[in-house]
Amino acid sequence: MDHVSSLPDEVLYHILSFLTTKEAALTSILSKRWRNLFTFVPNLDIDDSVFLHPQEGKEDRYEIQKSFMKFVDRVLALQGNSPIKKLSLKLRTGFDSHRVDGWISNALARGVTELDLLIILNLVTLKLNSVRVDWLAAGDIFLPMLKTLVLHSVRLCVDNVNWGGKDVNVSNASLKILTVNYNICLGTFSVDTPSLVYFCFTEYVAIDYPVVIMQNLFEARISLLVTQDQIERARAPNIDWVEDDVVLRLVNMEKLIKGIRNVQYMYLSPNTLEVLSLCCESMPVFNNLKSLTLKSHKSRGWQAMPVLLRNCPHLETLVLEGILHHVTDKCGYACDCVSREEKGCSLTSCPVKVLEIKGFRGTIKEMHMIKHFVNYFPCLMETNIYIEESGPPKLRVPQVCEFIAEMMEHYGKSSSFNVQLLVGGYLYKKWTAQ
């Protein structure tokens, strides 16, 4: 009697998990009992080297490649939606990138928690969400054709060591889209991606940014994660940058900002805007920037706003997602929070033509801020005010309309200047200067 075959299914699954997927599949010929056991193994080990051999002729190798891909497709189909723990994918020759995308997507959809990749030549798009990626000791992942890389809540590991606090280097000449979103503290972060057109970075501030090459960037979204302690230390007077490692880390953000200076569309979170207050003296000039979106929060300041607006000589659209912010004596040129003779001077050199105010609640402070912008932006042609939908406004819509009408009477602009009030995303009323 075959004593192994008499073991429970769970034990046999465990035994088969130590074999490659091809080796596990070969057990299906042993008996009916083994026919489909391999399809329930939670670990997939797909290695083209067990199919392809250097001595094979070119035509034979092509047929073997096709057979290999059909084998992988069949295994995944037989497994259906059963849970999977680990996918080990080792490909040393070119394959249909859409096929490979499908294999990885299949594993991700089935809840894979460990992804093991080795040299994939033709992969164009790779999106990883909430998985652990094991960088093999045998070599790096080589993706020369990659154009889109999205990492969301991904644990990058080397020899089972979490990359939190480690140096991260992304280098790819063909990559077009890069999204990094994870709440860990990095060591250094370098990115050498000359073809990149979209960059989304949601991270704690790294220790340093030694290399930042993104000269063809079209859109950037920077959302730094900082602690309240870091903010307080950044605001402290007489900061000693050399002695304070926390502040020095924040100051090094200037290297990342300089690396994206060719961008045309840029979004900055409240934390990012506050941290930039430490980089005002080294703020780059954004010669290509056409649209700037700034998100505000009542606990974060606008200290960097004056120099940022001055350094956008071709800015056309300014989007403010909220205009209430932490008041300091350093943001006054860009707003009217603090009374001073020179108020508004940083706005007079800004060529912005379209101003969008989102999340408007109708407070007196907000209305004064809008008046301030309308008065000091010399090239302003259009102002769009979006009423906040997530709560009752401080004033009723008719009162807001009265305020806008009065503002249009007292603040003379070109006859082509107009203000639009939008409620729920729809135009409620429009005013045009007389």
Curated annotation (Swiss-Prot):
Instruction: Quote the SUPFAM superfamilies the UniProt record gives.
Output: F-box domain (SSF81383), RNI-like (SSF52047)
Domain spans labelled F-box: 1-47
Query: Which keywords are on file for this protein?
Result: Leucine-rich repeat, Repeat
- A Pfam family that this protein carries is F-box
Q: Where are the LRR repeats?
A: 125-153, 157-182, 265-296, 297-322
Q: What is the name of the protein in this document?
A: Putative F-box/LRR-repeat protein At4g13960
Task: State the organism of origin.
Answer: Arabidopsis thaliana
